[in-house]
Swiss-Prot record:
It comes from Bacillus subtilis (strain 168). Keywords: DNA-binding, Repressor, Transcription, Transcription regulation. Gene3D superfamilies: Tetracycline Repressor, domain 2. Residues 2-62 form the HTH tetR-type domain. PANTHER family: ACREF/ENVCD OPERON REPRESSOR-RELATED, ACREF_ENVCD OPERON REPRESSOR-RELATED. GO terms for biological process: regulation of DNA-templated transcription. SUPFAM superfamilies: Homeodomain-like. This is Uncharacterized HTH-type transcriptional regulator YvkB. GO terms for molecular function: DNA-binding transcription factor activity; transcription cis-regulatory region binding. The lineage of its organism: Bacteria, Bacillati, Bacillota, Bacilli, Bacillales. Residues 25-44 bind DNA. Pfam families: TetR_N.
Amino acid sequence: MRPTNKRILDAAMQLLVKKGYRATTTKEIAEKANVSEATIFRNFKNKQGLVEALLSQHSSNRGSILEQTEGDLYKDLLHIGTCLLEELEHRKDIIKISFREPAMFQDVINHVTEYPQSMKQLLVDYLKTMGEKGVIQTGNEAEHADVFMSIIFGYFIHRLHLGDRVISMPQEKMLEHSTALFVKGISAD
């Protein structure tokens, strides 16, 4: 990516998170990025083009996550949960934008939910495999995945909006503790 486009996208992200889509103008983005407004129009066509470019920056590779599992339920779920939380953290600005003006940003919301949906399917597939091996209770893999993801999402959203004012447990400890509780709840024995 050209340095000019990176500056424009960085400025757009900062302003969109701070002010929202409607309140942010291309003129403000241009000023913050130290470019002319014409440069924005030439490179991105309009403000919606900027949003689309921001979304295209946030693609992930979930396939390698399962390749790094070991067959140990606790370690694997800890790894999957850590990857999910790291990806959410990586996408937090896009998520903030989608929360500010959800009616305007159906494309953003669709983009934001794409990764978690694919992670849920990955988790369901993993849990089915572990069920077939007799490690966990079978038959409720989708529900188990929903619960596990809700733990991760709940922590992320809480931190996004409230910081550590209520849940002060560090991320690593929260992941370890909640994963241990979850594993205990779904284990076959």
